[in-house]
Amino acid sequence: PHIGRTNRWLAPIGAVDLDGDGAVEVAYIDRPHLAKTLRVWRFKDGALVPVADLPGLTNHRIGETDIGGGIRDCGQGPEMITASADWSRVMATTLTDGQLSTRDVGRHVDRSSFTTALDCEPL
């Protein structure tokens, strides 16, 4: 999706059927240093269509060499793992009936916090 200006980018979270409807959704953070918005899109009828947005989340900081977080399934369906916009918390977000809901899963300390969350371990 177009985000407007040069030198702006998207930080992928992953692509999987997030809501159990059989269609694959694509999740990413729109401009992780500026907009800090989780966006979910679905490929439908030959085009990408927006599904849901949720502000206040991010997965990359200026100077980092990788993108943190990802998608996990701890037995109750896929969850997108990101950080809160201020990097204080690790967040798990689900897609249900076209709506995103997020919950705090623990304190963000460093990159190992993402690894722990993705491994379904408590923080």
Go through each PLM region and give its residues.
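Beta-propeller-forming repeat regions
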Residues: 1-123
